[in-house]
Amino acid sequence: AAEGGLKYWKLAGTWLEEERAEYRLARSLLQAQNHASAVAHAERCVDVCIANNASPFERFFGYAVLAIAQLRGGDRPACAVSRQRALDQYAMVAADEKQWCEAEVNELRS
């Protein structure tokens, strides 16, 4: 379902929907224990954010899912870099948006 969502958001949506669909697909792949594919889609999520000068809120989620995927895939050095990038973006997230980041922040800090 997540792959279908990505396909159709790329056709009908903006970069924001594509980025969020990449995030959702990475999360789904993590649930399926497909860590390598999760890393690839998380990297694409981050790439879309960078290419479109996304807000810290969007970048936070990209780097967070990337760090989580890298950790579960056993790449601790890459995870440490992505984790720090996620937390750096989180520090710049608007106060009224931080509540939406709590689950990922807790996951990064555990």
Language-model-derived ranges and their functions:
Residues 2-10, 43-51, 84-95:
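Amphipathic alpha-helical segments of tetratricopeptide repeats
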